[in-house]
Regions:
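Conserved small/polar residues in nucleotide/adenosyl-binding loops
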Residues: 177-179
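N-terminal extension/subdomain marker
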Residues: 2-175
């Protein structure tokens, strides 16, 4: 798929590894590392729920655990290498349309790659910008996890201003592939 089709909109197609269809997708899924920063008990409950099953919980560093010792970063990298055994190339040069269940009902979403040339976190009025302030003191830990990491896990949610529902809902209506 040509990235020229997406020039100027801030997202591009990508290659996405997905858990095998027989995986426990509930255990695999995990909220972003910057959530529940003052609630370590939340993360303990998730850890208990996941147990020894493959999970993105093992691929992230929850911010409530900062600062992290180097051996924690090493454990995350080892978990990423292990995860490669339960992942398969679900999508190549494309997007992943998903339906997720939240406390307020079902929500649709689109997993995609962000064009980082269109992103700034310093308050600039770029096409893609955060909804909350970036805490610069937490960036070194994020960089430590990414340095030498064999995987990159999606961890941002972009909000789409589409009141007429012209983007995701028509794609969902096509129901191209279900996993």
């Amino acid at each position: 798929m040509s990235n020229d089709l997406f020039a100027g909109i801030g997202v591009v197609p990508g290659t996405f590894l997905l858990p095998r269809p027989d995986a426990n997708w509930t255990a695999w899924a995990c909220v972003a590392c910057d959530q529940y920063t003052s609630e370590p008990e939340y993360w303990q409950r998730v850890n208990t729920l996941v147990g020894h099953q493959p999970s993105t919980l093992r691929l992230i560093l929850p911010e409530c655990d900062l600062p992290a010792p180097p051996e924690r970063i090493d454990a995350i990298h080892a978990a990423m290498r292990d995860a490669l055994n339960v992942l398969h190339p679900g999508v190549t040069d494309g997007f992943v349309l998903l339906e997720r269940t939240t406390s307020t009902g079902k929500r649709l979403g689109l997993v995609c790659c962000v064009d980082l040339e269109q992103y700034r976190y310093d308050g600039a009025k770029t096409l893609i910008r955060p909804t909350e302030e970036t805490v610069a003191s937490r960036l070194p830990a994020r960089l430590a996890v990414r340095n030498g990491a064999p995987l990159e896990s999606s961890h941002v949610m972009l909000l789409l201003d589409d009141p007429q529902r012209t983007v995701i809902e028509p794609l969902y209506a096509l129901s191209l592939i279900h996993i």
